[in-house]
From Swiss-Prot:
Pfam families: Catalase (PF00199), Catalase-rel (PF06628). The lineage of its organism: Eukaryota, Viridiplantae, Streptophyta, Embryophyta, Tracheophyta. Disulfide bonds: none annotated. It is found in: Cytoplasm, Cytosol; Peroxisome matrix. Catalyzes the degradation of hydrogen peroxide (H(2)O(2)) generated by peroxisomal oxidases to water and oxygen, thereby protecting cells from the toxic effects of hydrogen peroxide. GO terms for biological process: hydrogen peroxide catabolic process; response to hormone; response to hydrogen peroxide. Keywords: Cytoplasm, Heme, Hydrogen peroxide, Iron, Metal-binding, Oxidoreductase, Peroxidase, Peroxisome. The gene is CATA. Belongs to the catalase family. Heme binds at residue 348. This is Catalase. PANTHER family: CATALASE, CATALASE ISOZYME B. GO terms for cellular component: cytoplasm; cytosol; peroxisomal matrix; peroxisome; plasma membrane. One of its GO terms (molecular function) is metal ion binding. Homotetramer.
Length: 492
């Protein structure tokens, strides 16, 4: 064994107890005292180390997506998309790539029930031959806001009050009464899909718009979609109360038990693509994260399948320390100018550095499985053994060179420096279309959830009227029904 390169694992456990530094421990039951009843001695280093380690076991929970469950498996390409992207892991049908997936609730804390009405996170880390690719999405295809400037305020509105530490509906409807762009997202959150049956029976979406780059440098805007082969199933409100009151971890248990029984969850991956030169041809902005791309004019294209066939070995190491960031991409898949995506590129990595430290990408679950090399040395909790003499670039001693240039197409950008909203807001059309796609019973459940939210004692008449106006612009009958239930006169 090379003593300088040994990485501790549970597979190398000794047959007896030791301290963290490896010294044998002959008594792990009793503290060192003066006599049988005397005071504990400070020299009992094993006791001090044991308590100190225990005091530091927990790390800051994620500011969002704190409650989560992970599983491992593989992604397999089933359809040729090599004409659209030069991404190596998508190079040909039959190619398999290891993955780890984390499902989560968004707003609520680490120990909260998995039956609360909340979006679900759906994050996939692909361990490719050209580095990791993190596809960090949700189970709903759109989002509440289109500009990341509003993200901290939005999360504050959803999170418990800083005064009472309780989540309060009046704060949510107050904040979003200023943001009609949220209406489309609320047609998902307040719909039946707002509470998935479990993680196996829910869709996944990349949500943001990315860019695919082909080998000849052609760019296509792209949306990613995961479809479960076992179908989408949801819990109605009363069912969620019953399930959540019985087991707070029902979705995690279902995922773990299904994999252990050999009933492996599977999703099909589809994409929608738009020629980057044609993005102005629609009545919506393809970079607007509050909009879906109509499948009748931009059809889904099959790409591959993902199978989760292995449970994680350790919750802390492979769930709490598992870190995702939309900035982590591979050649052939790039960002777009989606305002929310641009914000996430910074924020996700920044929050992981806060939770896990500057070297979080060295943790085994986050590290790439391919060979990699840079001069990002040292820092807190750097545990990679290095023996290089050259930690700078360029060098005539170290032969490390630049990689081949990506076929990124050139772009000409022009415009004034300004803070502004997009031209094509169109906040009401898609929300109304989705509401009208519901059957009458589903429409009524959606309406009742809004009545419940808007009859909170702290919700003012002004806020109620604004929401009636918004929903009236989506669908006149919905606005009238909401006004009638709230006993207020509609403005439209």
């Amino acid at each position: 064994m090379d003593p300088y390169k040994h990485r501790p694992t549970s597979g190398a456990n000794s047959a007896y107890w030791t301290t963290n530094s490896g010294a044998p421990v002959w008594n792990n039951n009793n503290a060192l005292t003066v006599g049988h009843r005397g005071p504990i001695l400070l020299e009992d280093y094993h006791l001090i180390e044991k308590l100190a380690q225990f005091d530091r076991e927990r790390i800051p929970e994620r500011v969002v997506h704190a409650r989560g469950a992970s599983a491992k498996g593989f992604f397999e390409v089933t359809h040729d998309v090599s004409q659209l992207t030069c991404a190596d892991f998508l190079r040909a049908p039959g190619v398999q790539t290891p993955v780890i997936v984390r499902f989560s609730t968004v707003v609520h804390e680490r120990g909260s029930p998995e039956t609360l009405r909340d979006p679900r996170g759906f994050a996939v880390k692909f361990y490719t031959r050209e580095g990791n690719f993190d596809l960090v999405g949700n189970n709903m295809p759109v989002f509440f806001i289109r500009d990341g400037m509003k993200f901290p305020d939005m999360v504050h509105a959803f999170k418990p009050s800083s005064k009472t530490n309780m989540q309060e509906n009046w704060r949510v409807v107050d904040f979003f009464s200023h943001h009609p762009e949220s209406l489309h997202m609320f047609t998902f959150l307040f719909d039946d899909v707002g509470i998935p049956l479990n993680y196996r029976h829910m869709d996944g979406f990349g949500v943001n718009t990315y860019t695919l780059i082909s080998r000849d440098g052609k760019a296509h805007l792209v949306k990613f979609h995961w479809k479960p082969t076992c179908g989408v199933k949801c819990l109605l409100d009363d069912e969620a109360v019953t399930v959540g009151g019985t087991c707070h971890t029902h979705a995690t248990k279902d995922l773990t038990d299904s994999i252990a029984a050999g009933n492996y969850p599977e999703w099909k991956l589809f994409i929608q693509t738009i020629d980057a030169d044609h993005e102005d041809r629609f009545d919506f902005d393809p970079l607007d994260v509050t909009k879906t791309w109509p499948e009748d004019i931009i059809p889904l294209q099959p790409v591959g399948r993902m199978v989760l066939n292995k449970n994680i070995d350790n919750f802390f190491a492979e769930n709490e320390q598992l870190a995702f960031c939309p900035a982590v991409t591979v050649p052939g898949i790039h960002y777009s100018d989606d305002k929310l995506l641009q914000t996430r590129i910074f924020s996700y990595a920044d929050t992981q550095r806060h939770r896990l430290g500057p070297n979080y990408l060295m943790l085994p679950v986050n590290a790439p499985k391919c060979a990699h090399h840079n001069n990002h040395h040292d820092g807190l909790m750097n545990f990679i053994h290095r023996d290089e003499e050259v930690n700078y670039f360029p060098s005539r001693v170290d032969p490390t060179r630049h990689a081949e240039k990506d076929p990124m197409p050139p772009r000409v950008l022009s415009g004034c420096r300004e803070k502004c909203i997009i031209d094509k807001e169109n906040n009401f059309k898609q929300a109304g279309e989705r509401y009208r796609s519901f059957d009458p019973a589903r429409q009524d459940r959606f309406l009742q959830r809004w009545v419940d939210a808007l009859t909170d004692a702290r919700v003012t008449h002004e806020i109620q009227s604004i929401w009636v106006s918004y929903w009236s612009q989506c669908d006149a009958s919905l606005g009238q029904k909401l006004a009638s239930r709230l006993k207020i006169k509609p403005n439209m």
